[in-house]
From Swiss-Prot:
PROSITE patterns: HD. Residues 55-181 form the HD domain. GO terms for biological process: dGTP catabolic process. GO terms for molecular function: dGTPase activity. It comes from Mycoplasma pneumoniae (strain ATCC 29342 / M129 / Subtype 1) (Mycoplasmoides pneumoniae). This is Uncharacterized protein MG461 homolog. CDD domains: HDc.
Length: 425
């Protein structure tokens, strides 16, 4: 097989070279191909019409960034098998995403606060990695599926000697975040993500400390790292946590709350959408996603989901469900209102809820979950490491005044934490 490459508007091209061309067999699996029909931004495209790019292109982008990182001289001492394991983990890291991407994870939650409960896409990804045909493809190329799964799912145990591998895929500055910030900014038409990723890659170093490899960034790269963190913060403010998108996602949370109640009363029919029923019915009955659902899950994508909602809207005789689906499909009737304090929010919630018949389907409290500006605070091993001109090693939080003051600057006086989401009367 010759080299395989894709043209890409963000990175120029995605290349499967002589060392990695076997990984194209993973791209051709059904689990990976379905990502062509899973939008990267879920339902945000309702408000950012250009944002219809997919998990497929993003996953290829993450692979390509990792390939370029690992081909730099800094990573020359690293064993080729380790490099290929990182590349595979980057390529496959999102194959467990459901229709509507992250939004799906809250549809079956008890409360609409983006807390993962019954469906966690990282766990589903690891199920795919440890199932056929992906498992056999990896083993045939001397790649350990369990290590790949551990790199993707942070809840899985990882040897300290392999922390550097996970950092390239999941950290405050990793290939995943590099690609989605660049890609999402480009396709939504925003200008936040002016990230000099090429220089960041050149300034990365892989150094042995006490016998264990660690990732370092040269200190002259500090302004680029700070810009990267600010960019991510602004993207969450303006794109990922857009109030209209939250309202739309919670509109569908209400839809599934109503479906759940109808299922409990044996009054709901999936109208022939068998694969969707095989995945959603257990979740509606509070059963955690498991391996036996994979054959049905791999058939689901955004188009199946949308077809289901349209069919349900046209056929349902339930007035509440009809009203909720009309809002989602035709003209969004849900709004979000933010409050300065929890007490103000709760008081207004009680006042507004009294105006609704069947209020639990039309108004809810919502606690906006802010992403941390710098998550390295949570664990010393997750800190971004800086290598000074004097060849000394330090942590980003010790050298960056911006990171030191990030909570004060970005979160202590946040005005958009407490909210109500409600159907407009």
């Amino acid at each position: 097989m010759q080299q395989i490459f894709f043209k890409d508007p963000i990175l120029g091209e995605v290349l499967f070279d002589q060392q990695t061309k076997w990984m194209y067999e993973l791209v051709e699996t059904e689990a990976f191909r379905r990502l062509r029909n899973i939008k990267q931004l879920g339902i945000n495209f309702h408000f950012y019409p250009g944002g219809v790019h997919t998990r497929y292109s993003h996953s290829l982008g993450v692979y390509e960034l990792l390939r370029r990182i690992l081909n730099t001289p800094a990573f020359a001492p690293i064993d080729e098998n380790k490099k290929q394991t990182v590349l595979v983990a980057g390529l496959l890291h999102d194959i467990g995403h459901a229709p509507h991407s992250h939004a799906f994870e809250i549809y079956f939650a008890k409360a609409p606060n983006f807390k993962k409960e019954l469906f966690i896409h990282e766990e589903v990804t690891t199920l795919f990695v440890n199932s056929e045909p992906i498992k056999s493809i990896l083993k045939a190329n001397q790649i350990d599926p369990k290590l790949v799964a551990a790199l993707i799912d942070e809840n899985k145990e990882l040897k300290p000697s392999n922390y550097w591998m996970r950092q390239l895929i999941s950290s405050d500055l990793d290939a995943d975040r590099m690609d989605y910030l660049l890609r999402d900014s480009y396709f939504t038409g925003t200008s936040h993500s002016l990230i000099d990723y090429q220089t960041i890659i050149k300034e990365m170093d892989c150094v042995k400390v006490k016998g264990i490899y660690e990732i370092f960034f040269k200190d002259k790269c500090l302004p680029l790292i700070e810009n990267f963190l600010i960019t991510r913060h602004h993207m969450y403010q303006s794109i990922y946590s857009d109030g209209r998108s939250i309202s739309t996602e919670l509109n569908l949370w209400f839809v599934f709350q109503r479906i759940k109640d109808l299922v409990d009363k044996n009054q709901f029919d999936f109208n022939g959408y068998k694969t969707l029923e095989q995945v959603c019915l257990p979740l509606l009955k509070n059963e955690h996603f498991d391996k036996k659902m994979l054959p049905a899950f791999v058939k689901l994508d955004d188009y199946v989901f949308q077809s289901f909602f349209v069919n349900l809207y046209q056929t349902t005789k339930d007035k509440i469900l009809k009203k909720l689906l009309d809002s989602y499909l035709n003209s969004l009737k849900f709004e979000i209102k933010f409050y300065e304090t929890k007490e103000q929010r709760d008081l207004d919630f009680e006042k507004q809820a009294s105006k609704y018949k069947d209020a639990k389907y039309f108004i809810t409290k919502f606690n906006n979950q802010f992403k941390g500006f710098y998550e390295g605070w949570s664990s010393h091993k997750n800190e971004l490491k800086i290598k000074t001109m004097q060849n000394k090693h330090t942590n980003l939080s010790e050298i960056s005044m911006l990171v030191k003051r990030s909570n004060e600057l970005f979160f202590e006086n946040a005005l958009y934490k407490w909210a109500n989401v409600f159907y407009r009367l």
